[in-house]
Amino acid sequence: MYFDITSLRRFFLFISLVLFISTSYAADDIGRLRYFILSGDQGKITHGTIVTEDSIKTQGASIHLVFANGMGFGPAMMTTKTTLNSQSHTLYSENIDVSYTIGGEWSFTLGYGRAMNGRGEIKNGDEYVTSSVKGDALFMLFGMPFVFGELVGGLRGSKHEFGPYQKTENGTETQLEQNIISQTVQMMLGYGLHF
Protein backbone atom coordinates (compact mmCIF):
# COMPACT_ATOMS: atom_id res chain seq x y z
CA MET A 1 0.00 0.00 0.00
CA TYR A 2 1.22 3.51 -0.78
CA PHE A 3 -0.13 7.06 -0.76
CA ASP A 4 -0.94 8.90 -3.97
CA ILE A 5 1.65 11.69 -4.16
CA THR A 6 -0.51 13.80 -6.51
CA SER A 7 -3.39 13.83 -4.04
CA LEU A 8 -1.02 14.65 -1.18
CA ARG A 9 0.42 17.50 -3.23
CA ARG A 10 -3.03 19.01 -3.81
CA PHE A 11 -3.94 18.69 -0.15
CA PHE A 12 -0.69 20.32 1.02
CA LEU A 13 -1.04 23.10 -1.55
CA PHE A 14 -4.53 23.93 -0.27
CA ILE A 15 -3.45 23.92 3.38
CA SER A 16 -0.32 25.93 2.60
CA LEU A 17 -2.31 28.63 0.81
CA VAL A 18 -4.66 28.94 3.77
CA LEU A 19 -1.75 29.27 6.20
CA PHE A 20 0.26 31.74 4.16
CA ILE A 21 -2.75 33.97 3.46
CA SER A 22 -3.57 34.15 7.16
CA THR A 23 -0.96 36.24 8.99
CA SER A 24 -2.60 35.71 12.38
CA TYR A 25 -1.01 32.29 12.84
CA ALA A 26 2.54 33.28 13.69
CA ALA A 27 4.88 30.78 15.32
CA ASP A 28 4.72 32.65 18.67
CA ASP A 29 8.27 34.03 18.34
CA ILE A 30 9.86 30.64 19.07
CA GLY A 31 12.90 29.51 17.12
CA ARG A 32 13.41 25.76 16.80
CA LEU A 33 16.27 23.47 15.83
CA ARG A 34 14.87 20.06 14.92
CA TYR A 35 16.50 16.72 14.24
CA PHE A 36 14.52 13.87 12.66
CA ILE A 37 14.88 10.18 11.97
CA LEU A 38 13.04 9.06 8.82
CA SER A 39 11.85 5.49 8.47
CA GLY A 40 9.31 3.67 6.34
CA ASP A 41 8.40 0.46 4.55
CA GLN A 42 5.53 1.68 2.37
CA GLY A 43 5.93 2.63 -1.24
CA LYS A 44 6.17 1.66 -4.88
CA ILE A 45 9.24 1.28 -7.10
CA THR A 46 8.75 1.29 -10.88
CA HIS A 47 11.21 0.38 -13.64
CA GLY A 48 9.42 0.50 -16.99
CA THR A 49 6.54 -1.97 -16.73
CA ILE A 50 7.99 -3.72 -13.65
CA VAL A 51 6.51 -2.59 -10.33
CA THR A 52 7.07 -3.69 -6.75
CA GLU A 53 5.45 -2.68 -3.48
CA ASP A 54 7.18 -5.39 -1.42
CA SER A 55 10.31 -5.30 0.75
CA ILE A 56 10.81 -1.55 0.39
CA LYS A 57 12.85 -0.04 3.24
CA THR A 58 13.56 3.67 3.54
CA GLN A 59 15.76 5.26 6.20
CA GLY A 60 17.21 8.71 6.63
CA ALA A 61 17.74 11.80 8.73
CA SER A 62 16.94 15.49 8.61
CA ILE A 63 18.01 18.68 10.38
CA HIS A 64 15.58 21.58 10.27
CA LEU A 65 15.95 25.17 11.48
CA VAL A 66 12.68 27.04 12.10
CA PHE A 67 12.84 30.81 12.61
CA ALA A 68 10.59 32.78 14.96
CA ASN A 69 8.42 33.90 12.00
CA GLY A 70 7.53 30.26 11.28
CA MET A 71 9.65 29.79 8.15
CA GLY A 72 12.09 26.89 8.20
CA PHE A 73 14.63 25.06 6.06
CA GLY A 74 17.18 22.27 6.22
CA PRO A 75 18.67 19.19 4.53
CA ALA A 76 17.12 15.71 4.47
CA MET A 77 18.95 12.56 3.36
CA MET A 78 17.17 9.31 2.51
CA THR A 79 18.17 5.85 1.31
CA THR A 80 15.63 3.40 -0.13
CA LYS A 81 16.49 -0.26 -0.71
CA THR A 82 14.47 -2.94 -2.47
CA THR A 83 14.68 -5.89 -4.83
CA LEU A 84 13.03 -5.51 -8.23
CA ASN A 85 13.10 -8.22 -10.89
CA SER A 86 15.80 -10.12 -8.93
CA GLN A 87 17.99 -7.01 -8.92
CA SER A 88 19.12 -5.13 -5.81
CA HIS A 89 18.26 -1.42 -5.93
CA THR A 90 19.74 1.29 -3.69
CA LEU A 91 18.34 4.80 -4.12
CA TYR A 92 19.95 7.68 -2.21
CA SER A 93 18.75 11.30 -2.31
CA GLU A 94 19.82 14.57 -0.71
CA ASN A 95 16.97 17.05 -0.38
CA ILE A 96 16.49 20.64 0.70
CA ASP A 97 13.32 21.16 2.74
CA VAL A 98 11.38 24.37 3.34
CA SER A 99 8.48 24.64 5.77
CA TYR A 100 6.03 26.85 7.61
CA THR A 101 5.16 26.30 11.29
CA ILE A 102 2.25 27.68 13.30
CA GLY A 103 1.70 27.56 17.04
CA GLY A 104 3.90 27.76 20.11
CA GLU A 105 4.69 24.84 22.38
CA TRP A 106 2.05 22.89 20.46
CA SER A 107 2.83 23.30 16.76
CA PHE A 108 1.82 22.25 13.27
CA THR A 109 4.19 22.27 10.28
CA LEU A 110 3.71 21.86 6.55
CA GLY A 111 6.73 21.45 4.31
CA TYR A 112 8.08 20.78 0.84
CA GLY A 113 11.34 19.09 -0.12
CA ARG A 114 13.26 19.15 -3.40
CA ALA A 115 15.89 16.61 -4.46
CA MET A 116 19.25 18.26 -5.15
CA ASN A 117 21.71 15.35 -5.38
CA GLY A 118 21.64 11.60 -5.24
CA ARG A 119 22.83 8.26 -6.48
CA GLY A 120 21.17 5.10 -7.69
CA GLU A 121 22.66 1.62 -7.97
CA ILE A 122 21.33 -1.56 -9.58
CA LYS A 123 23.25 -4.76 -8.82
CA ASN A 124 22.81 -8.28 -10.14
CA GLY A 125 26.16 -9.40 -11.43
CA ASP A 126 26.38 -6.25 -13.54
CA GLU A 127 26.26 -2.87 -11.81
CA TYR A 128 24.43 0.11 -13.26
CA VAL A 129 24.74 3.50 -11.57
CA THR A 130 23.39 7.02 -11.90
CA SER A 131 24.13 10.28 -10.12
CA SER A 132 21.05 11.99 -11.54
CA VAL A 133 17.93 12.36 -9.40
CA LYS A 134 14.94 14.67 -9.50
CA GLY A 135 11.76 14.82 -7.51
CA ASP A 136 10.04 16.29 -4.51
CA ALA A 137 8.43 15.54 -1.18
CA LEU A 138 5.66 16.84 1.05
CA PHE A 139 5.52 16.52 4.81
CA MET A 140 3.23 17.33 7.73
CA LEU A 141 4.38 17.49 11.36
CA PHE A 142 2.88 17.94 14.81
CA GLY A 143 4.87 19.13 17.82
CA MET A 144 4.21 18.86 21.56
CA PRO A 145 6.15 20.17 24.59
CA PHE A 146 9.00 18.01 25.93
CA VAL A 147 12.09 18.85 28.07
CA PHE A 148 13.34 22.30 26.97
CA GLY A 149 11.81 21.84 23.55
CA GLU A 150 9.41 19.60 21.69
CA LEU A 151 8.75 16.12 20.40
CA VAL A 152 7.85 16.27 16.71
CA GLY A 153 6.32 13.62 14.50
CA GLY A 154 4.51 13.25 11.22
CA LEU A 155 4.45 11.84 7.70
CA ARG A 156 6.53 12.49 4.60
CA GLY A 157 5.59 11.43 1.08
CA SER A 158 8.33 11.43 -1.56
CA LYS A 159 8.49 10.84 -5.30
CA HIS A 160 11.90 10.67 -7.00
CA GLU A 161 13.11 9.67 -10.44
CA PHE A 162 16.61 8.20 -10.79
CA GLY A 163 18.38 7.91 -14.13
CA PRO A 164 19.61 7.43 -16.74
CA TYR A 165 21.51 4.38 -15.46
CA GLN A 166 24.69 3.26 -17.17
CA LYS A 167 27.64 0.92 -16.79
CA THR A 168 31.10 0.95 -18.32
CA GLU A 169 32.78 -2.34 -19.19
CA ASN A 170 35.97 -2.71 -21.24
CA GLY A 171 35.64 0.90 -22.34
CA THR A 172 32.10 0.35 -23.62
CA GLU A 173 29.26 2.33 -22.05
CA THR A 174 25.80 0.74 -21.80
CA GLN A 175 22.72 2.71 -20.76
CA LEU A 176 19.35 1.46 -19.52
CA GLU A 177 16.34 2.67 -21.47
CA GLN A 178 14.07 3.43 -18.49
CA ASN A 179 14.60 5.38 -15.30
CA ILE A 180 13.63 4.17 -11.82
CA ILE A 181 10.69 5.94 -10.15
CA SER A 182 10.43 5.72 -6.37
CA GLN A 183 7.28 6.67 -4.44
CA THR A 184 7.66 6.20 -0.70
CA VAL A 185 6.10 7.27 2.59
CA GLN A 186 8.16 7.77 5.75
CA MET A 187 7.44 8.46 9.40
CA MET A 188 9.33 11.51 10.67
CA LEU A 189 10.12 11.40 14.39
CA GLY A 190 12.36 13.87 16.16
CA TYR A 191 13.20 16.38 18.85
CA GLY A 192 13.23 20.16 18.58
CA LEU A 193 15.20 22.52 20.81
CA HIS A 194 13.50 25.90 21.41
CA PHE A 195 15.54 29.10 21.45
Place the predicted regions along the sequence by residue.
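Outer-membrane beta-barrel translocator domains and adjoining extracellular loop/strand segments
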Residues: 42-54, 83-91, 118-132, 163-172
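Repeated loop/turn-to-beta-strand initiation elements of outer-membrane beta-barrel proteins
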Residues: 69-75, 105-110, 146-153, 195
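Hydrophobic, lipid-facing positions within transmembrane beta-strands of outer-membrane proteins
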Residues: 57-63, 92-96, 136-140, 183-189
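Outer-membrane beta-barrel translocator/channel fold
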Residues: 80, 111-135, 152-162, 182-185
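Transmembrane beta-strands of outer-membrane beta-barrel proteins
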Residues: 32-41, 74-78, 109-113, 152-158, ...
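Outer-membrane beta-barrel "beta-signal"
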Residues: 146-148, 181-195
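Short glycine/proline- and aromatic-enriched beta-strand/turn motifs that initiate or cap beta-hairpins
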Residues: 25-85
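Cleavable N-terminal export/targeting peptides
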Residues: 1-32, 195
